[in-house]
C-alpha cells in the first residue's frame, strides 16, 4: 500500500518572537497551546504563508475579524515579521520517501504601505541529518547567529553535493512542483484554484461552516468532467472547423471567381501590354527604317530645293533690278499723263473763262445802258417830287392866308412852328449851328452862288466825258489783249508788240496743223518699238529658262523639236497613269485580302488555343473535326463507367459510416432505444457492464451471451413487468437479465467452452451453440478495434471515392469544354493558318509600294519635262510672230525723230490754242494802239464829284430859301396857343392839301424806289465789273500756269499718255507678278527648305531616338523575354490574337484590366504594391513581375495534397472539381459529427449518476462523525428542476426542436442555450452570450444542487447552517466538509499525478477550546481514519491525549521579546518527552 506523504516540521526564522524555531509536526494532531499572544496564530500564519505565498490572498485576521470585509492594513503579515530577512519553511517527506523542503523568504519593505516581499523556493535531495535552521543561519559565537540572505543560501546549497535549490518567479510554478511531489492535493493552475485552496485553509483555520465553501460546494466537491467537456469541445471544434471549412469552401468558390477574375484580368493587363510592346517593337523597327528612308529622301529633296532656290534668287534679283527702271518709267508716264490731264483741264478752264469774259463784257455793256436809263428816270422823279413839294407849299400858304383871315392867331401859331422846323432843317443841311432867321438871307445868297457854280462845272465835265469815252474803250480792249498774249508791258510799246504777235500767230497756226499726222505716225512707231522690246524680253526669258542662248534663225527648228517632245511625253504620261492604276488596283486587292485574313486570324488563333487546351487536357492530337467527335463519344462512355464505379464506392462508404456510427454509440449499444429502455427500467446495459472486457476475451463473451449481448441488467425483474405492458418502441427481441449491476458475473449460464466456440445450456432442454465471431463487437476494446479497421477501410474508400468523383467531374468538364469547342470553333479550327499568307501578302504589298514610289518619281520627272516643254512652246508661240521686229534696228531712231517734230508742232498748237482768240480780236483794232487816252479815268472821277457838289448846293439853297421866306413867322410865338374853329373853305383847302401831300408822298416814294433801283443797278454794274476783273485776272493766271506746265494739250495727248502709262503699268504688273511669284516661290522654297531642314533635323533626331529606343527596347525586351521564359509564362502572355489589335485597343484593354485589378488586390498589400510598381510605363518588366507575383500568390494557395499542379489556371479548374467534392464530403461529415441531443442527455445523466454514487460513498465516511448534538453529516445532491426538464426534452422531445440543432448558423452549445431559454422564458440570462450559456449547460455540475445536512438531536436531518448549530458543532461540521473536499480533490487529481504518490493531508483549527473532549476525540478519530494531519491552537487548559503538544509562552528579556516553546508527545500512557529544540533568543 502506498504511504501517504507527511509534513515533518515547520521552521520560522526571524519572525516576531521566533528567531530560529523548528516545530516537528505530529503524524496526526499537533496542538499549539498557550495563552493569549503566545504566538499560536503567528506559527499557523507562517505555515499558511509557506503553503500559499500569494499576497493577494493572505489575510491573517483575529477571530473577532471573522466576517469583516476589511482588516488591518498589513493584512496580519507585516506585523508578524521582524526587520531583516525572514524565512518560513516546511520540511516534508512524500510517498516516495523523498525529503523536500519548501518555503518562502520574507522581508519587510520600507514604506508606509507596510508591504512584504516574498520569494518562494524549494530544496530537494537534502540529507535527513541536516536541520532547516542550519541551512538559513550562520553561528557567529555561542550566543549569536546571523540569518543568511537568499543568495547566500543558494550558494551554500549549491556547494552541497546532491542538493538542488530552486527559486520560483511565479506561484504557479511553486505550486506545480508541490503538486508533482505530493505536498498539496490539487494542481493549482490559476489564481482561482489558489483562491479555492486558500479559502479551504482559511475555513479550517478559523473553524465553523464557511459560507464561501458551502455556496460553491459544486466547485469544491464535483470534479470538472474535462474529458466529456473536451469531447464536446472537440466535437464543436470539429463541427466549427467543418462549417468553417464549408464556409471557406464557399468563400473559396466565390474566391475562385475572384481568382479566375484575377488571372483573367492579370493576363489581360500584362498580355495586352506584353503584346503591345511586341507590336510597338516591330512598329519601332519599321519606323526606324522608315525614318532612315525619309531621312535620305529629305536630304535629296533639300539639295534639289537649294539648287532651285539659287536659280529663283538669281531671277528675282534680275526682276528686282528691272522693276526699279519700270517703276521710274511708269512714274514718269503717270506724271506725264497727269500733266497732260492738268493741261487739258487748264485749257478747258481758260476756254470757259474766256467765254465767261465775253459774256460778262456783253452783260456789262447792257448794264451800262440800264444804269444810264435809270439815271434819266431818277432825274424825272426828282423833278416831279419838287413840283409836288411846290404845290404842297402853295396850298399850305393859301390855307394859311385863309386861316389868317379866319383866325389870325391860329395861323400865326402854325406858321411859327413851321418856321422853327425849317430853321432847324437849314442848320442841319448847311452845317450852320449859329444860323438864325435874321442871317438866313445873307447865307442864302452865298449858297445860291455856290449852286450856280457847281452846276456850270458839272455841265462842262459831262460834255468832255461823252467825247473821250469812245476812244478810251477801244484802246483798253486792244491793250488788254496784248498784255494777255505777251504779258505786262508799257502802254507805249503796245503797238509794236501787237504787230509782232500777229506775225508769229500766222506761223504757229501752220505748225499746229501738222500735229495730228505726226501724232499718228509716232503712235504707230512707238507701238512697234514696244512690241520689239517685248519680243526681246521674251527671247531673253526663254533663253534663260532653257539655259542656253538661241539665235533668231534657230527658233523655228527649236519649236518643232519641243512639239515632238511634248507628244512623246504625253504618251509616256498616259501609259504611266494606266500602269499606276493597275498597281493601285492590285494594292487594293492585296489590302482587302490582308484585311480579311487579319479579321479571320484572331478567330483561328482562338480556335487553335481552345484546340491545344483540349489536346493538353486529354493528351490526344486532333487532325480533323471527325477526330473530335469520335473522342467526344469515347469521353461519354468513360464518364458513364466512372459514375457507376463512383456510386458503388459511395454506397460501400455509406455502409461503413453507418456501422462506425452504430459502434460509436455511448454504452456500446447499437440501438439507441436500448439506452432509453435501460434508463426507464432503472437498469444497465450488459454491454456497459462488460465495457472494459479485453480484446482477447471479447470473442468468448460475445459467443457466451449470443443474441442476449444487448440485454438490460435490472435489479428486480418483477418491477419491470408493469413497464413491459404496451411497450412498442423497442427491438424485436428484448433481453432482460436480473442481477446487481455493481457485482454482476457470468454465473447465470451453464456453459461448456469448445474450440473457438461455446455451448450454452439455457435450460435442460435447450442448448445454444455459438462460435467465436471473427470480428467480435462485445466490449469497448473490440468495438474500438473494429472501428479502427472500419476507419482504415473508410479512408481507402474515401480516397477512392474522391478520386472517382474528381475523375467524373473532370470528365464532365472536359465534355463541356468539347461541347463549347464544337459549338464555337469547330468550323474554323482545322482551316489553314492565315498568318503565313498574311506575311506573304505583306511582302508583296511592300514590293508594290516600292514600285509605286519609283513609278511616282519617274512620272514626276516626266511631268516636269512635259511642263517645261509646254512652257517653251508657249514662249516660242509668242516670240515667232515678232521675228521681223527683232530684226529692225532703225526703229528707235525713227521714233526719236518723229517725237521731236511732234513736240514742235504740239508747242505751236498749244500757242494757237492759248492765244488764237486774242489774236483774232486784236487784229481789227490794233490801229487804236497808236494813241493812248490816259485822262479818261480822271475825267470820270471829276464828273462824279461835280455831280455830288451840285446836288448838295441845291439842297442847302432850298433850305435857306424856306427859312428866309418864313422869317416873318418867327414873331408869332405868342399866338401858338390861340386856335379857333374852321370854316368850310378851310376844310376844302385842307382836303386838297392832303391830296397834294399824298401826291408828294408818292413822288417821294417813287423817288426813293428809283433811287434804290438805281443803287441796285449800280451795284450789279459794280459786281459785273468786279467779276469781269476777277475772271480776267484768273484767266491770266491760268494762261501763265499752262505755260509753266510746258505740255501741249491737244485732243490726242491724253490718249497717248494713257496708253503709254497703261503699257508701262502692264509691264510693271507683269514684272511684279513674276516677282511676286518668284518671291512666293522663293518664300515657299525657303519655307520648304526650312521645313525640310527642320524635318531633316527632326528625322535625324527621331531616327537616332528611335534607333536608340530600339536598342534600349531590345535590351529591355531581352530582359522581359528572359523573365518570361524563366518563369514559364510565355504561353500565357504571348497571345497571338492580340497582335491584331491596335495599340489604343491594347492600351484600353490594359487600362480596363488595371482598374479591375486595383479593386481585386485592394486587400492584398504585396500584390497592391507590386501592381502599383508595375504601372510604370518605362519598366515593362515590372508587369511581368506582377504577373509572376499573381501566379506565385495563387500557387501558394494551391493545396498540393489535393491539386497536383503548379499552374494556377489548371489549379482553378481542378479546384472547382475538388471544391464540389469537398463540399459534398464535408456536408456528410457534418451530419456524422453532429452528436444527437439524446446522446448528450444520456452522457450528462450518466455523469450525474456517477457523481451521485461518488458523493454517496463520501457520505458513508461521514456517517459516524458526531459533534455535540450532531449525530451524522451528509451531502445531499439533487438535479435542478429546470435542468431536469431540459434533459427530458433532449432525450424524448428533441424532434420538436430540430430547428435549433439542424441550424448551420448555431453551434450545439448555442442551440442548447436557445432551447434552455425556450423552455425557461422566466429566467433572466443577463448579458451572457448563448455560447457561454451553452457551455455551462454542457457542464454536468450546473445541473446539480448540493447542500450539507446534519442529523441533530430530535430535529432529524436539517440543513447545516451556523445559526442552527452551536459553535463546536459548526466547527466539527465544517471540518467534516473540509475533509470531504480534500478527499474529493485527491480523487480528482489521482489521474493527473503519478500513481505512486499519495499527497499530504493537513488542516488547521484555531481556537479549538470551543470543542468539547468528545468532539476533539472525534477529530482525532477522523484524522486517524483518513491519515490526515491536523494543527490545533488551543488555550493551556486543553491537553490532548494523543499527538504532539507545544506549549508557547511569550517572554520579555532585556527589552527583547521571544517565545519560549516546550514540546510534549503523548501524556496518558507514556511519559512526557521533550522534543528537540532550544529556547534560544535571537541575537
UniProtKB/Swiss-Prot annotation:
Disulfide bonds: none
Top-level lineage group: Bacteria
Cellular localisation: Cytoplasm, Nucleoid
GO biological process: cell division; chromosome condensation; chromosome segregation; DNA replication
InterPro entries with a match to the protein in the record: MukB, MukB/SMC, MukB_hinge, MukB_hinge_sf, MukB_N_dom, P-loop_NTPase
Location of the region described as Flexible hinge in the Swiss-Prot/TrEMBL record: 666-783
Keywords of the record: ATP-binding, Cell cycle, Cell division, Chromosome partition, Coiled coil, Cytoplasm, DNA condensation, DNA-binding, Nucleotide-binding
Coiled-coil residues: 326-418, 444-480, 509-601, 780-804, 837-923, 977-1115, 1209-1265
Main location: cytoplasm
GO cellular component: cytoplasm; nucleoid
Chain sites annotated for binding ATP: 34-41
NCBIfam families: PRK04863.1
PANTHER family: CHROMOSOME PARTITION PROTEIN MUKB, DUF4476 DOMAIN-CONTAINING PROTEIN
Subunit structure: Homodimerization via its hinge domain. Binds to DNA via its C-terminal region. Interacts, and probably forms a ternary complex, with MukE and MukF via its C-terminal region. The complex formation is stimulated by calcium or magnesium. Interacts with tubulin-related protein FtsZ.
Domain text: The hinge domain, which separates the large intramolecular coiled coil regions, allows the homodimerization, forming a V-shaped homodimer.
Function description: Plays a central role in chromosome condensation, segregation and cell cycle progression. Functions as a homodimer, which is essential for chromosome partition. Involved in negative DNA supercoiling in vivo, and by this means organize and compact chromosomes. May achieve or facilitate chromosome segregation by condensation DNA from both sides of a centrally located replisome during cell division.
Record protein name field: Chromosome partition protein MukB
Organism the protein comes from: Shigella dysenteriae serotype 1 (strain Sd197)
